[in-house]
Amino acid sequence: MADRQHFPSAITEAVSSNTACPDTGPKAETTNIFLLLQRNITIESSKHVFSSIVEYILILTLMFAFSAILYVIYKSYISPVFYKKELTEVGFDHIPQGPDKGRRISRAQASRRMGSKLPPPYPNGWFAVAETRELKVGSVLSIDALGQNLCVYRGEDGLARCVDAYCPHLGANLAVGGTVRGSCIECPFHKWRFNAAGTCVSLPGSDIAPKGVSIRTWCVVETDGAIWIWHDAEGREPLWEITDPPELKDFGYRGRNEFEVSAHIQEIPENGADVPHLNAVHSSSLLSDLGERYPVLHEIIGRHVWNADWTKSDDHTSLMHITQEYKVLKYDLARIDVKVTQIGPGHVRLFLKTSVGPFYIAQSVTPLGPLLQKVIHRVYSPAYNAPVGAFLVRCEAYMFERDVTIWNSKRFVSAPAYVKTDKTIRTFRNWFGQFYSEHSLSFRDALQNPLDW
């Protein structure tokens, strides 16, 4: 057996252990060697396959993590978050699914009792009609809001302007096919041109513009990422000005959420003065609604605990301070301090202080119809917490949806059954009344002539 010295020791020992067996011939020895080689090869192959699988999983994990990081960077710094819900997407889960759900929702809305003595639907104030980022130089937008058809355009000088949509010549819609010429808007029908003051300054085939031909213009301000126009039923110049908050100089835009709400405009900001609703509607965790469905899990999953106070000023603003704590069992895991400033009927600014830095939210409420509001929240933050700011766009939207669900099916109650805790609601309604005036279009007239007054 001199040749055994050439085999690995494991094989040599195995072969030696077989010497006691009756079959000790060369054939049996060869078979044992083959089986041991096969077993070693199988083990080595299994190890190789296992290591390959682990390596493959690790590569996939790293690729996923890298892609996730790139996505977060992209949505935080390059392409802001945009979260939008149409009117029919929130608050209608009680209507069965099916191809006719849209019709059922329309029927439910039409049969809803709206209440009596509703305030005028279009109060006086500044209202956002377009997003700054969507109105490029030379572009034109068709806007229907405040019972008006509007043409919003950005001149070649970079300034945004707003005029009535219809040309005084033969009624063509300037926002549909109209062209920007310098600071002017040109009618698509006969090429009549109107300057920034609304005056017709030129038309083809004539060296002299017609006298006394003009189109209505609207006062415009750009701030908080939107284009705002001044609406006043008495035709007065703006009663107050709005400017950029100083914080925006160091903050970047992280995105916005947008909702259509079936309610009177007054009910949206009234929510702030309704302090008790915060813990009634917004205590359930954003992470899961299991605590709402199974109260025994409420403390384990966590809940939001709210404290707030609302005060009015002597002018067009009101102020609210909110503290929100997220509690799991008896432990406070996070706290947010919010300063809320209401500026007129359709503009709110929220400054948030958190453990991960400050944030700024600009809310606009714009009446698209007597009982249809467009509500937008634009979120800003410093660069270092941009990913959290992008996440906040959705978190704030999820909270706001809880209110929208209620608004989309409630009625307006002009004389509520007030209790002691509703004191701020009564005060709010008195304060908000300053935005209605003698010639404010009544709710009934707005329904009869929704886009012409």
UniProtKB/Swiss-Prot annotation:
Binds 1 [2Fe-2S] cluster per subunit. Its main location: membrane. Residues 126-229 form the Rieske domain. GO terms for cellular component: cytoplasm; membrane. GO terms for molecular function: 2 iron, 2 sulfur cluster binding; cholesterol 7-desaturase (NAD(P)H) activity; metal ion binding. Keywords: 2Fe-2S, Cholesterol metabolism, Iron, Iron-sulfur, Lipid metabolism, Membrane, Metal-binding, Oxidoreductase, Steroid metabolism, Sterol metabolism, Transmembrane, Transmembrane helix. It is an enzyme of class 1 (oxidoreductase). GO terms for biological process: cholesterol metabolic process. CDD domains: Rieske_RO_Alpha_N (cd03469). The chain crosses the membrane at residues 53-73. Disulfide bonds: none annotated. Its EC number is 1.14.19.21. It catalyses: cholesterol + NADPH + O2 + H(+) = 7-dehydrocholesterol + NADP(+) + 2 H2O; cholesterol + NADH + O2 + H(+) = 7-dehydrocholesterol + NAD(+) + 2 H2O. It is found in: Membrane. Gene3D superfamilies: Naphthalene 1,2-dioxygenase Alpha Subunit, Chain A, domain 1, Rieske [2Fe-2S] iron-sulphur domain. InterPro entries: Cholesterol_7-desaturase, KshA-like_C, Rieske_2Fe-2S, Rieske_2Fe-2S_sf. Belongs to the cholesterol 7-desaturase family. This is Cholesterol 7-desaturase nvd. It comes from Bombyx mori (Silk moth). The gene is nvd-Bm.
